[in-house]
């Protein structure tokens, strides 16, 4: 029997969880997520980025130990009134490459999120999409991929065999929710293979050269986000606030603007 306890009010700035990430260099960082900002960001993301409504069925395919699991298996869908599918297993050989499609059909999934690696593995086992045709995917509206580069070939293959829109988008543990995404719940932007779409409302994304000068289109540089950061982004590192502050750079572009290098 479950014991029912009185709910306890929390301040919006109270810590919700701490998640360690190694990043690409340096020692691991304890990302601190706050209650209020996380709730605001994820409710916005579920509705406006992923196009989900209360009563919809969402499937975030990840491990709860990663930020995708926290944001898009637990907090985001449940706060938005969605059913969330929790799945443990490989995309192939359980027993075959139709495992994902079987779950979509069985639970009437409306949208799913996974890493490109999973779809590349499915493609390798079922290049012509023969197994996918054995399942009813009429409930599925969108597929979202992130976590690594989604190559154009896999993007185009997945759209062809599934008959559904495929969207690449980008974010990371420090932000807790998407930085660039299609925003299908708003007007959205057409899926473009090789693109992770435009900046989500609230993020002011810039690309700078090594000297901190603003770059235009079709140039490679460092991606930065102008302050203030939107709700949901980490505001400190556990036990190492000085290190967090060191990552906040004062860079002058057309006018003095504080930027967060990511």
Positions of predicted regions on the chain:
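Single conserved hydrophobic/aromatic residue that forms the stacking wall/gate
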Residues: 1-8, 12-14, 251-262
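Structural core segment of the AMP-binding/adenylate-forming
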Residues: 6-9, 108, 115-116
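Conserved AMP-binding A3 loop
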Residues: 16-40
